[in-house]
């Protein structure tokens, strides 16, 4: 297929594939989590998934009703599991205190449930924002959650994704919609890495099924393989091409203007605002490119979806679902 670049990696001597595990997933009904659930099922795993709402029956999936604050539900989720992929968390809110409850306390509850059930293997989804916790409450909460994971007795691997895009994503959808009008306002100059949700999901499932020195107590920063990432203008133009625009106007806006826009978004959309003061804090940082020394080893995993093609396919999905 046009989107595939390279072939699936075969684990080397330092990584071995364990028997197909029972995988417990938090956040399985969200954007990244839903792709991860699909990847786990495609790999033949039995899945236990946490959900806040009733879900239709699905072959291979045991749904557990509850959330990260529900200790009984977390206990039921991890009971009998071989590995937990902890994805659930809060990425955006106008109330910074909510980051602490969801991302820090929620992670502590997952760790406690695993310890009580005797489950040792944890794949934890953090964020590249954790590299600079002083820039945002979100990044700070993810950094504190990472510290809890690292201080635990678990066999953990932490994954720090950059900007994640793909079908079912509602965050980058805003950029696609703006590009259709030919105008994509940008933060001050900088660069970012990106990764397709399907590639990220594939990595999480590989980590869940693997053992060995390459993954034990490691923190990885995966991306689409583009060296140096994407400048903000490059990404805006690529999204423009994906929606059929040969060129888009992509002005860099000063931080003060973005802060004013965040206030306006809060007035217009309330708690559903996408642009918040906290998000402005890390948007204005010039370097959200993954560190090359923290990319997952090629023997373990490599990206299969190149950015340009992935953005094109995502735009097509948005059109097909009438999101664009």
Task: Give the positions of each predicted feature.
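N-terminal Rossmann NAD(P)H-binding glycine-rich loop of SDR-like oxidoreductase domains
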Residues: 23-43
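SDR active-site strand-loop-helix element
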Residues: 26, 50, 84-88, 122-128, ...
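NAD(P)H-binding glycine-rich loop region in Rossmannoid oxidoreductase-like domains
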Residues: 55, 65-105, 113, 128-132
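Short-chain dehydrogenase/reductase
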Residues: 100-104, 135-146, 169, 193-195, ...
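Conserved Rossmann-fold NAD(P)-dependent oxidoreductase catalytic core, especially the SDR/UDP-sugar
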Residues: 101-143, 157
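Substrate-positioning beta->alpha
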Residues: 109, 170-174, 188-210, 216-221, ...
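Conserved beta-loop-beta element that borders a ligand/cofactor-binding pocket
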Residues: 147-167
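Mid/C-terminal beta-alpha module of Rossmann-like enzyme folds, strongest
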Residues: 210-274, 304-324
């Amino acid at each position: 297929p046009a989107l595939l670049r390279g072939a699936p990696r075969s684990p080397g001597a330092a990584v071995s594939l364990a028997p197909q595990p029972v995988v417990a997933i938090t956040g399985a009904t969200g954007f990244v989590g839903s792709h991860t659930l699909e990847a786990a099922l495609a790999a033949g795993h039995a899945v236990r998934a946490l959900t806040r709402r009733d879900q239709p029956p699905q072959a291979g999936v045991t749904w557990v009703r509850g959330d990260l604050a529900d200790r009984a539900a977390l206990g039921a989720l991890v009971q009998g599991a071989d590995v937990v992929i902890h994805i659930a968390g809060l990425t955006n809110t106008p109330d910074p205190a909510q980051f602490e409850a969801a991302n820090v306390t929620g992670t502590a509850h997952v760790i406690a449930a695993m310890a009580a059930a005797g489950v040792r293997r944890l794949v934890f989804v953090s964020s590249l924002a954790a590299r600079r916790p002083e820039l945002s409450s979100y990044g700070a909460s993810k950094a504190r959650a990472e510290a809890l994971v690292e201080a635990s007795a678990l066999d953990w691997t932490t994954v720090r994704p950059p900007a994640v895009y793909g079908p079912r994503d509602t965050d980058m959808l805003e950029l696609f919609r703006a590009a259709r009008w030919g105008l994509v306002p940008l933060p001050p100059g900088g660069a970012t890495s990106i990764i397709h949700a399907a590639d990220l999901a594939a990595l999480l499932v590989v980590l869940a099924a693997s053992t060995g020195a390459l993954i034990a107590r490691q923190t990885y920063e995966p991306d689409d393989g583009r060296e140096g990432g994407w400048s903000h203008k490059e990404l805006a133009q690529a999204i423009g091409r994906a929606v059929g625009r040969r060129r888009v106007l992509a002005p860099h806006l000063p931080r003060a203007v973005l802060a004013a826009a965040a206030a306006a978004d809060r007035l217009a959309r309330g708690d559903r605002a996408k642009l918040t003061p906290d998000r402005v804090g890390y948007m204005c940082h010039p370097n959200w490119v993954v560190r090359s020394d923290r990319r997952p080893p090629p023997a373990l995993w490599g990206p299969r979806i190149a950015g340009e093609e992935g953005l094109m396919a995502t735009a097509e999905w948005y059109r097909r679902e009438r999101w664009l």
